[in-house]
């Protein structure tokens, strides 16, 4: 294991350490360096951020010279490293070299174990870091068999091995574990085989399903049964299907859904593990409207409820909120539309029309990055989801890797080879577009954040950039000037009034409210009053509440009072929303229930 390469002449590094006003940042570090930012208030209470990069000649993690490198952390500079990967919780990191796999502790860099196995192509840690799954191409070394192996990480010994001729990133990992590693599953020829998670190979249960192509375990639930989602593609006149099973009663499904136009699909579980989104694809469009096939989106819950959003045009990206029972879809021809939905498929917020195809929620669910990558220009918008306000916009041309750090403050973009062979490198910015770190790395193949538990980071107060910061960080394209006019005196700048908090909203932005009539149409009962008329003057006096006879409310009257209270809360929330004040996403759900409250109130009043 070689020392970190600190003097790479082909590497250009740019760092910026000034944080936003009133914004403290956790320390940024890397596996080849422990860094200390200018802000130290959080370094004793929050973990250090870390990321890994791998290029043609180097595999290391680096943040910048002035942050202070940690030479105890591993680095490879001989070009032998073929892949690098963190464990699910970020405590371990594996370097896949030509002849071995070196597993190190992410914090100190000490070697945890070494697996002597050449030519490994893919690896995957089990959720609790008990096992490492590896796959290699069949060769003379493995006698063209037993190329899929489960290793005991501590002992670096083989626990299970079998043959697997084909493997790609879409179906990897080929063996999957539940979050607690109690149960494992593997797709084998029209069946899903389930094993004891610590005794792979001993069959416990199986699901038989003709032409099944994928399955996914639900996230961990507190003491509940394990749930499995399966997908079967359409075949001829037979529709595709998605099903939800509950282990161990896998002989029958809990809920199912059938659909056409689904030769492939991506199945996404929500955070509670009780509903899935099925993002379907086809290679061709029979209607002839697209060269790239057709897409669809279906919702299926464990209790059997389901719906299709009937979205017109391509679906570019779908993501569940990491904290709420909501999901977001980016869809339509360019400029595309991005919409936040609830579990009933009702739209909550439209984020406007823009050339975007990527959705990235921050781990704490308070921030959102909408980007346009791939064949788009790399434009990005950062949104405050606590107020539904656009914070700022920026660009990252040709970015391949885009992801939030665990602190929900920093965002990394990376231009990677071999897809893009020029301008390779990484850039780390804050949500207000403050550039924290930038490095050009020729022939960069990998870049990724170290996984950390987002709950250990405090939710920072969201700070909006000033007008001057927005102008400096996002320069506007210049108007073309003919050469004959370039020496002429420039026109004086146009003075504009300062915008309100946040960047301008895109065209089509909309927050949906319930279509019901305002609850102000409900008139609460007035207290008894007496009216007297003297000299054409009418005087109304209201008896003090203390003079009213007291009596216990009936159950129906108590329910009416409770509904009235909810309607008053809705009125307050609507006023806050209209005035641009803070309103959490959960409050939108309450506003949308206004019609339901009114109907309940009318029904209760009719029972009096």
UniProtKB/Swiss-Prot annotation:
Give the originating organism: Dictyostelium discoideum (Social amoeba)
Supply one GO BP term.
Answer: regulation of translation
Q: What Pfam families does UniProt report for this protein, alphabetically?
A: eIF2A
* Residue stretches in coiled coil: 550-608
The terms describing its cellular component in GO are:
cytosolic small ribosomal subunit
Query: Under what name is this protein listed?
Result: Eukaryotic translation initiation factor 2A
Which keywords accompany this UniProt record?
A: Coiled coil, Initiation factor, Protein biosynthesis, Repeat, Translation regulation, WD repeat
Would the keyword RNA-binding be found if you checked this record's keyword annotation?
Answer: no
What job does the chain carry out? Answer: Functions in the early steps of protein synthesis of a small number of specific mRNAs. Acts by directing the binding of methionyl-tRNAi to 40S ribosomal subunits. In contrast to the eIF-2 complex, it binds methionyl-tRNAi to 40S subunits in a codon-dependent manner, whereas the eIF-2 complex binds methionyl-tRNAi to 40S subunits in a GTP-dependent manner.
Which regions are flagged for Low complexity bias?
466-478, 520-544
Q: What is the lineage of its organism?
A: Eukaryota, Amoebozoa, Evosea, Eumycetozoa, Dictyostelia
Q: Locate the compositionally biased regions of type Basic and acidic residues.
A: 545-554
One GO MF term on file is: translation initiation factor activity
Against PANTHER family, the record matches this protein to: EUKARYOTIC TRANSLATION INITIATION FACTOR 2A (PTHR13227:SF0)
